[in-house]
Amino acid sequence: MSKKNIVLAFSGGLDTSFCIPYLKEQGYAVHTVFADTGGVNEEERDFIEKRAAELGVASHLTVDGGPAIWDGFVKQLVWTGETYQGQYPLLVSDRYLIVDAVLQRADALGTCAVAHGCTGMGNDQVRFDLAIKAQGNYTIIAPIREIQKEHTQTRLYEQKYLEERGFGVRAKQKNYTINENLLGITLSGGEIDKWEAPGEGARGWCAPRSAWPADPLTVAIKFVEGEAVAVDGKPLSGPQILMKLNKLFASYGVGRGIYTGDTVIGLKGRIVYEAPGLTALLTAHRALEDAVLTKQQNRFKPHIARKWVELVYEGFFHDPLKTDLETFLKSSQANVNGEIVLETRGGRVDAVAVRSPHILTSKGVTYAQTADWGIEEAEGFIKLFGMSSTLYAQVNRSLRS
């Protein structure tokens, strides 16, 4: 009797390593997919492939997730110009692209059974499950959630489970839970979870202040219809742009912060995050929009943007409302063309120059300096513009007297 195929989102870590023998003992032929979204080097990719083979998978597939994460998430996030709760730039949104890779593999194998290694306490389980459910009638198996029903020390249980079956466990145990991809890095655990100051080890790409270069960094980013297409005059693919900006701005400590916010399941979450490239892109794009969008566009767009960010954070990546909002966002980018010059001396980044044919200026007019209208026109505008407030004050003064 042939075993039923199941496709597992695999990272090579303890949780997903445990999932393979666990699922095999449930009667499945396990096929693993590793979606490389930019968080590993070639050596780590090789380790993941060998680890899957060691654990006895039926097949293993590595997928380049860089183009998908740019086209499916980064472009739209930059269009919004927003972060979750005004701070966090949605750095684990690669989960949705990982799901896509898993489902494509499942469809190719003709199976509806898929699995992931998410725990039952975090946000990722929500993102994985909702993204899967939105795309078809798939059966979701979550082994870590299953064992958490019976075991409180789940990681110790997983280690023992693997060792009893002859599989080694990496001797080096990390002090922090680290998520790394093209978007950036998040760190949690240890003193971070205890609401204390992060230790020196709680650092990813971003250099500490003592290591910042003495000379300032200046970088020019070109946008076409809201999408970054070149850095310092050199055309690059989206993933290449983000990788380059990550490297440049990380050396100046740009994009690092401590975030405390509301998780999907209602708990408070606290992480250290680093997103140097995204921070640079968002800063540049916002400066260009400020110059080329109308007053009403710049006023209204943040309402749409905040809702889009909330939907993505909370797992509604495939909700029709998200698609509707993206239609508006894409339309708003028609004139977001030009080049922004960014500058950093460390820690923060500023847009210091804007170059675009779409800047909303008028010949002969400079704010607070020169104008092509008369004094009487200005006075008339002020009178009409403030009519409601002026009448309110007049009426209430007369009533009080």
From Swiss-Prot:
Signal peptide: none annotated. Disulfide bonds: none annotated. ATP binds at residues 9-17, 35, 117. It comes from the Bacteria. GO terms for biological process: argininosuccinate metabolic process; L-arginine biosynthetic process; urea cycle. Coiled coil: none annotated. Keywords: Amino-acid biosynthesis, Arginine biosynthesis, ATP-binding, Cytoplasm, Ligase, Nucleotide-binding. L-aspartate binds at residues 119, 123-124. Pfam families: Arginosuc_syn_C (PF20979), Arginosuc_synth (PF00764). Pathway: Amino-acid biosynthesis; L-arginine biosynthesis; L-arginine from L-ornithine and carbamoyl phosphate: step 2/3. One of its GO terms (cellular component) is cytoplasm. GO terms for molecular function: argininosuccinate synthase activity; ATP binding. Its EC number is 6.3.4.5. PROSITE patterns: ARGININOSUCCIN_SYN_1 (PS00564), ARGININOSUCCIN_SYN_2 (PS00565). It catalyses: L-citrulline + L-aspartate + ATP = 2-(N(omega)-L-arginino)succinate + AMP + diphosphate + H(+). It is found in: Cytoplasm. Belongs to the argininosuccinate synthase family. Type 1 subfamily. Homotetramer. HAMAP family: Arg_succ_synth_type1 (MF_00005). This is Argininosuccinate synthase. It comes from Xylella fastidiosa (strain 9a5c). The gene is argG.
